């Protein structure tokens, strides 16, 4: 069977489960947003990788999110492949822009959920500057 998307899926690579949950959290805090399109190539830290000085407040949110994920990777309890931030699923609720991580999450899921929650709330508090989307990474992120 062949699946065809009219939404430009060829532009968006398949996303691990946790990143899809992070996407949903951003949609909760910023209704009407398209996180996979808007944030995957923003500044120096939003999307894959990250280096240099963040270009603005939104990019700082992404750097803090990256740093948060780095902390969970250092926790020996969360070092198995099932617990890495990009694939570990967690439970949370969204109500009118408010995000709550479930008390039922295990230690690793709780940490990852809180990383994503903090970043999604941060995104909602800072401006999105179109000029920092798809910047020249090599020259501006040193």
From Swiss-Prot:
Transit peptide among keywords: no
Tissue occurrence: Expressed by the venom gland.
Annotated residues for binding of Ca(2+): 45, 47, 49, 66
Catalysed reactions listed for this entry: a 1,2-diacyl-sn-glycero-3-phosphocholine + H2O = a 1-acyl-sn-glycero-3-phosphocholine + a fatty acid + H(+)
EC number: 3.1.1.4
GO cellular component annotations of the record: extracellular region
Disulfide links within the chain: 28-94, 44-141, 46-62, 61-122, 68-115, 78-108, 101-113
Cofactor(s) this protein requires: Ca(2+)
Cofactor comment text: Binds 1 Ca(2+) ion.
Top-level taxon in the UniProt lineage: Eukaryota
EC top class named in words: hydrolase
UniProtKB keywords: Calcium, Disulfide bond, Hydrolase, Lipid degradation, Lipid metabolism, Metal-binding, Secreted, Signal
Family as reported in the entry's similarity comment: Belongs to the phospholipase A2 family. Group I subfamily. D49 sub-subfamily.
Designated name of the protein: Acidic phospholipase A2 KBf-grIB
């Amino acid at each position: 069977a062949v699946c065809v998307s009219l939404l430009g899926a060829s532009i968006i690579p398949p996303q691990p489960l946790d990143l899809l949950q992070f996407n949903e959290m951003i949609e909760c805090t910023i209704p009407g947003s398209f996180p996979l399109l808007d944030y995957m190539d923003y500044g120096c830290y939003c999307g894959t990788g990250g280096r240099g000085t963040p270009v603005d407040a939104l990019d700082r949110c992404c750097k803090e999110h990256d740093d948060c994920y780095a902390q969970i990777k250092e926790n020996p309890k969360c070092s198995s492949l099932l617990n890495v931030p990009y694939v570990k699923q967690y439970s949370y609720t969204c109500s009118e822009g408010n995000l709550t991580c479930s008390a039922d999450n295990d230690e690793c899921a709780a940490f990852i959920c809180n990383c994503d929650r903090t970043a999604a709330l941060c995104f909602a508090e800072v401006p999105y500057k179109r000029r920092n989307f798809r910047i020249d990474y090599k020259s501006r992120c040193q």
